[in-house]
Amino acid sequence: MKLDWMSFTFALRNLLRQKGRTGMTLASIVFGVVGLILSGGFVEDVFIQLREATIHSRLGHLQIYREGFYAHGSKEPYAYMIEDPAAVEAKAAAVPGVVDTMKRLNFFGLLNNGKTDLPIIGEGVEPAKEAKLGSFFFIIEGRQLTDDDAYGVLLGEGVAKSMKLEVGSFVTVLANTPDGALNSLEFEVVGVFRTFSKDYDARAVRVALPAAQELLGVAGVHAVVVSLADTLTTDATAAAMKAAIGGDGYELKTWFELDDFYAKTVDLYKSQLGVLQLIILVVVLLSVANSVSMTAYERVGEFGTLKALGKRSGDIARLIILENALLGLIGATLGVLLGIALALGISAVGIPMPPPPNSNVGYTALIRVVPSVILVSFFIGFLATVLSAILAARGAARVPVVEALRQNI
C-alpha cells in the first residue's frame, strides 16, 4: 500500500468510523500532553521566580571583588579592600547590558539594644541604588533606608524579633577596625526588611555606606555589585567584564556562583520533572496501547477481508500505523492548544504558593508557556501513539487470512 493522499483519506475515514475508540485514544493523548505542558511550565516558573528573587533580594547579577576576597575575605576582610571603587564602577558600567553598579562594605559585629548583644552581619550600602535593585527586598515595617539617613539602620526580620526592636528604637553597632580596635556607632531603626532567605534575615543589618566606613575606619569597599538589564545575558556580560577588569587584580562572581541553593533546587526539580515525564509517558503509552490493541482486535475480520482482496500483511501494518500516526498528530496538536490555553488561564489567576524552605516569603506561581517544553510534550504524545501502533500492527498483521475471516461470521 503506497502512502498517497488516498491512503490518508482512507485512514481518516477509519478513525471517524471508530468514534468511541478514537475518542478514548485522543483523550489519553491530550491528557498526557497537557500534563507535560502544565508541569513543565510550572517548574520553569519556579526556576525563574527563585532566580529573580535571589538576584533582586540581595546578590545582584554580578559581584566584583579584590582578587582572593571570595576565598580568604572572611578571615582577612581588610586585606582585600577595593581602594578605588569608582574606577572599577566606571569599567563595569562601560560593559554593554549593565544597568547600574553599587558599592558594598561588609562587616561582622555586635548589635546592642541596651540589654543584650546579637552577632550580626552588616552591610554598608548605597540606599538609592539598592532600592532599585531590591524588588524582592520587602520592607515590612517602617520605610526604606535613604541617602539622607546618615545614621539610620535597616534590620532583618529575625534580628528585630530577637532583639525586640521596632521602628524608632536606637541601637549600638560594634565592630573591629583594621588595627584591631573596637569602634561603635549609634543608629536609629528606620525599617525592618524581609528577603527570600530566612537565615540572612536572622542576622543581617544595613546602614548607609558612609556610616559603615566611619564605623570601620576605612575608605574602600569590599564589593561592587552589578545589575543587568536581562538575567539571561549574565554569562556573556560576565565574560566581557572579566576581560575588562580581570587583569587589574579583581575577580568576578555571578549570582549563580554565589548561591548554591539555587543550583541544588534546580537539580532537584529537574529530577522530579524527569520522573513525572516518565510516568506520564508510561501512562499515555499504556492507555494508547490498550485502546489501539482493542481497536485492532475488533477489526481483525476487516483485515482478513483486505487480505482476501490482495492486501499483504505489510499493507495492513502500514494502515494501522498511518491511522494512529494521524491520531497522534491530531491528539498532540489538541493537547498543545489546550495546554497553552490552560497555562494562560491559570497564569491570569495565579497559584498562591507557601514560602519555600528557608524563606518567609510566599509567592504567586504561574504556568509559563515554554517553547521547548511544548515541543517535547508534542513529540512525546505523538511518538507514544506511533510506538503503540507499531506493537499493535505487528500482532494484527500476522493473523492468518482464514482465522481473520472467521471473525466476520
Regions flagged by a language model, labelled:
Residues 1-37, 408-409:
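N-terminal Sec/SRP start-transfer signal
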Residues 369-409:
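C-terminal membrane-exit region of the final transmembrane helix in multipass inner-membrane proteins
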Residues 46, 333-377, 390, 394:
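Short helix-loop junctions at transmembrane helix boundaries
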Residues 104-107, 116-126, 138-210:
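Hydrophobic secondary-structure segments that place a key small or acidic residue at a functional site
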Residues 19-46, 267-302, 325-334, 383-387:
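Hydrophobic alpha-helical transmembrane segments of multi-pass inner-membrane transport and secretion
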Residues 40-121, 144, 148-149, 243:
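Hydrophobic, regular-secondary-structure patches
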Residues 293, 302-346:
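Transmembrane alpha-helical interface segments in multi-pass membrane proteins
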Residues 177-273, 280:
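Mechanotransmission and gating elements of multispan inner-membrane complexes involved in transport
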